[in-house]
């Protein structure tokens, strides 16, 4: 398990865009499982939507991308590089995410070749699938 400080050593994201509170599982270069506690105090909930706060789907995708970046950046050969989000395909949202939900974010890297990586991401609330999609990452020099 990795706490928030260890996550910050892997990826450069910080408040308010850091979407991973801890990593429960990490297999460098293969897969990672992270957790995000969705608080009623999240800045994005002020406007999405004031009378019915929901976590935007794009931020669920961002959470998957950050967990995938942790799996990619945990490889020693990627030290000194930055994993950037290259794209997303076949995204589906299955369930709304609201304050109080605890997200379990799973990403499996399906292909890493050179500076490009691909992965499958899923976001769960409990046992319910909330979102899923295919992710593309690119490694660049810092």
Curated annotation (Swiss-Prot):
SUPFAM superfamilies reported in the protein's UniProt record: Thioesterase/thiol ester dehydrase-isomerase
Class in the EC hierarchy, top level: lyase
GO MF annotation list: (3R)-hydroxyacyl-[acyl-carrier-protein] dehydratase activity
Catalytic activity of the protein: a (3R)-hydroxyacyl-[ACP] = a (2E)-enoyl-[ACP] + H2O
Function description: Involved in unsaturated fatty acids biosynthesis. Catalyzes the dehydration of short chain beta-hydroxyacyl-ACPs and long chain saturated and unsaturated beta-hydroxyacyl-ACPs.
The family this protein is said to belong to: Belongs to the thioester dehydratase family. FabZ subfamily.
Protein name, per record: 3-hydroxyacyl-[acyl-carrier-protein] dehydratase FabZ
Organism field: Natranaerobius thermophilus (strain ATCC BAA-1301 / DSM 18059 / JW/NM-WN-LF)
């Amino acid at each position: 398990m990795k706490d928030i400080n260890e996550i910050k050593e892997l990826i450069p994201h910080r408040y308010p865009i850091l979407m991973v509170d801890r990593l429960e599982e990490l297999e460098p270069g293969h897969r990672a499982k992270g957790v995000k506690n969705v608080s009623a105090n999240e800045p994005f909930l002020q406007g999405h939507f004031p009378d019915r706060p929901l976590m935007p789907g794009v931020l669920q995708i961002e959470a998957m991308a950050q967990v995938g970046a942790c799996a990619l950046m945990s490889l020693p050969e990627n030290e000194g590089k930055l994993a950037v989000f290259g794209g997303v395909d076949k995204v589906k949202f299955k369930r709304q995410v609201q304050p109080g939900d605890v997200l379990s974010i799973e990403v499996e890297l399906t292909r890493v070749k050179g500076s490009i990586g691909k992965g499958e991401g899923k976001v769960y609330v409990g046992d319910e699938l909330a979102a899923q999609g295919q992710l593309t990452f690119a490694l660049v020099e810092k």
